[in-house]
Amino acid sequence: MHSTPLIMTSSLVIIFTLLIYPILTTLSPSPQNPDWGLKQVKQQYKLAFLVSLLPLFLFLNEGAEAVITNLSWMNTHTFDINISLKFDHYSIIFTPVALYVTWSILEFASWYMHADPFMNRFFKYLLTFLIAMIILVTANNMFQLFIGWEGVGIMSFLLIGWWYARADANTAALQAVLYNRVGDIGLVFSMAWMATHLNSWEIQQIFFSSKDMDLTLPLIALILAATGKSAQFGLHPWLPSAMEGPTPVSALLHSSTMVVAGIFLLIRTSPLMENNPTALTLCLCLGALTTLFTATCALTQNDIKKIVAFSTSSQLGLMMVTIGLNQPQLAFLHICTHAFFKAMLFLCSGSIIHSLNDEQDIRKMGGMHHLTPFTSSCLTIGSLALTGTPFLAGFFSKDAIIEALNTSYLNAWALSLTLLATSFTAIYSLRVVFFVSMGHPRFNTFSPINENNPAVINPIKRLAWGSILAGLLITANILPMKTPVMSMPPLLKLAALAVTLLGLLTALELASLTTKQIKTTPHLTPHHFSNMLGFFPSIIHRLSPKINLILGQTIATQIIDLTWLEKVGPKTISSINTPLISTISNIQQGSIKTYLVLFLTTLALSTLVLLT
């Protein structure tokens, strides 16, 4: 057993070396070959994935619970910071999943970005991102986790704004940074609280020394951090906007890896939450609200990437619900299964978008199963996995989550919202399949559409296998940490499937109605609510600046200029002097009556003075 930590640490060091080596080669003054990314980087990713399987098999074979490696880094009199690596179920399974998904996406990017003059830099950014993600996943202290957290944040900014000549891409990148910065405040606050109250950032030590303390404040800060990074309700608008980045970026960062960092943080710190009902209820209600709101928004979107982005946000809400149920292992299982089919949905979308001359509107697609049968089939598999079709990857995690939710004694409001969102998932997933794959083509005839490129087929094929088998493989090899409910009424057992089927039937009915309709769609508020994203961007991004500008204008021009510089100064002096001036000027009008009255008044006054 003593060799296990050595093998695991060595494997991680080899993975880091394999990923850092291509970045170091770019530092040489001589320019890289155009195929550097395709040949060298893809090869390194493949090797890194194969190396990451070694600790996974070793871990599963030995039945270990966690292996921790500690190296001293910085010591002060009162505070120690170590390089501490934690190999447990979470890090040891997520690392191969992330590498496998990234390897597929990178190969796809070599085709998708082939005309980009800076493709090598793009690959370098993806490498740096993955290194930051692995640091975050394997960290056993808050400081290391923070380094990985900020690393994925800055790479997200650079990759969303990749096409920096486009105003929308720049705006989306800045939006992502600003929303994430709000979340980062939560993480920094919780770290500061831990440093001052617990005098440690080591996660194990924090668990031990905080047993009898009220942790509500730092836990709310951690939930704020997760809300920012994982696009929960309130800080969610950046995720759909991030679709301005290239499709491989959306597939990697904004579906399978970076956006789950917030949920992963809560999974890592879940022992702190176990006995804190405030934090758990907050997670449960926030997750339920997110999953329903974003699923509602996805119902009426027409941009294929936006629909997949909202579905990502909806699934992140479901993971947050699971953490609120105090089932972090189920949330992690959903992270792993979700990574495969969501990345595949994005790659299929990217392939179709490219085939149709960069057309993203699903109303202008249709009949793609005739032209791109493989991509359309995989899009359908991914959509079915997303809805939780039995025995595909999504079923194993989604069904378990909804069973846990149904049999819990917690908030019935959250339960009903989540079930409704599950039904909506089926509706928008089938809507995508119906509009993109089925029916007749609704686009102009372009140059011949060809999907027979290995760089397109192979990545989607690998992710399709993952979408079919990942759930079974992971559930078969991980023992549940909490005892699942062994018996439940058939109604509760079948609730998830029932609402999904209801959603599918609704979607079919709606799709057939929309293809036959003659009248134009009436302007209904619920439709606008969904289509305009709940009026959230309009209120937050438009109304707030507008109110600020109006207030600024009122204060600057009307209050300061009009009141202080005009009314208090010149106008006040004028208003005091005017009556006096008018009185005096009336006397000097040359009237003999006035002069006689003045003469007599003066005479009377002077006589009075003399007599007294």
UniProtKB/Swiss-Prot annotation:
Its EC number is 7.1.1.2. Keywords: Electron transport, Membrane, Mitochondrion, Mitochondrion inner membrane, NAD, Respiratory chain, Translocase, Transmembrane, Transmembrane helix, Transport, Ubiquinone. Its main location: mitochondrion. It comes from the Eukaryota. The chain crosses the membrane at residues 4-24, 48-68, 92-112, 122-142, 145-165, 183-203, 215-235, 247-267, 279-299, 307-327, 330-350, 376-396, 410-430, 463-483, 494-514, 592-612. InterPro entries: NADH_DH_su5_C (IPR010934), NADHpl_OxRdtase_5_subgr (IPR018393), ND/Mrp_TM (IPR001750), NU5C-like (IPR003945), Proton_antipo_N (IPR001516). It is a multi-pass membrane protein. The keyword Iron-sulfur does not apply. One of its GO terms (biological process) is electron transport coupled proton transport. The keyword Phosphoprotein does not apply. Belongs to the complex I subunit 5 family. Core subunit of the mitochondrial membrane respiratory chain NADH dehydrogenase (Complex I) that is believed to belong to the minimal assembly required for catalysis. Complex I functions in the transfer of electrons from NADH to the respiratory chain. The immediate electron acceptor for the enzyme is believed to be ubiquinone. This is NADH-ubiquinone oxidoreductase chain 5.
